[in-house]
Amino acid sequence: MALVDVLDFIPENHPKRKELIKIIQDLADTLPKYQDKTGLWYQVLDKPNYRGNYLEASVSSMFMYGYAKAVSKGYLDKKYMSIAEKAYNGIMEHLIVKNPDGTLTLTKCCAVAGLGGHPYRDGSVEYYINERIRDNDSKATGPFIMGCLYLRR
């Protein structure tokens, strides 16, 4: 997502621009291997069967947005839009809750995760799957909304 966004500010003739687009293309080929059948991605991508790992909203929203925008900008072939669509459908089916007042809630957002500080944030699977989960975190809702715009939803 961030790499796709930053290309908006890198001139077309920049000598490293093609390298950045190649990174996006390589990621686009790799990430579907970790996409769950629901269309979502796990908090720890490569450990889907790890006890306590869960299908997470911010990563799924960020990847949905990244794919949709990269296709729209021409960095990826149109065939990759189906990955964004699958993610959108998964988010709508499994992570969006319609509230009694008509508003929507995006669930299963990791509140925060990162590295650094001893012994906290050690980068272990246990650390990542045990971080607090919250609803409507902006790092999930923002990419979800942006992805919806690129998907024309």
Residue positions per predicted region:
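Hydrophobic core segments within long, regular secondary-structure runs in both alpha-
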Residues: V4-L7, K18-P32, M64, A68, ...
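Oxyanion-binding "anion nests"
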Residues: A2-P48, G52
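Amphipathic alpha-helix from the class-I
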Residues: V4-N13, K69-G74, L151-R153
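CBM-like carbohydrate-recognition segments
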Residues: L55, V59, M64, S72-R153
